Amino acid sequence: MLHFVGGKNTFDQHHGPLFIDENFANIRGPGEAIGIHSGHHEGLQRNHFRFQEGKFHCGQVNILLALKDIGPGDGGTVIIPSSHKSNIRHPEFEKNSMKKGKVTSAENMTASKEIYLKAGDGLLFVDSLCHGSAKRTNKGERRIVVYRYGPSWGFFRHPYRPSKKLLSNLTEFQKKIVMPHEQVLSPNNKENKII
């Protein structure tokens, strides 16, 4: 993961080697899907992609681990190859993008590729790659675990924080990955407690 997130002796590793931004399980049943999202055209710092002087500098790298086989009809992850390098929005992006209250999927987009995995397989990709999922048409559930890593200067996008108990059980190296910031200041945090 260090190979993709940032370079040694750069600002990307100012607080630690990298940052595990989030991890979660995703369970999806028949008829469910995730519309296309991300893409380099959005220009977000959080999920940027850059390759310079022989080194990767990725704002967020995802690892999807299949807990069950994912084949045709199982709602596999869909990617748009090379979209992490394009500054131009895919012409079918809006039609297939994530929308609240509406199930959209990405498997019929031009140039899209649905990825099939065996239980235990992992899929690694930079978050600026346009991705989503196909609609699950088979019975049963698609089950995956997602881990997202980024440079040490990143911070949680959701209000979840590692517990003091978890942090006390980690090595110093592990702590730098799970919580690279020793103290986080906030204008609403008068006592300057870690938030």
Model-derived segments and spans:
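Non-heme Fe(II) oxygenase catalytic core, chiefly the N-lobe of the double-stranded beta-helix
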Residues: 1-119, 132, 137-140, 151-161
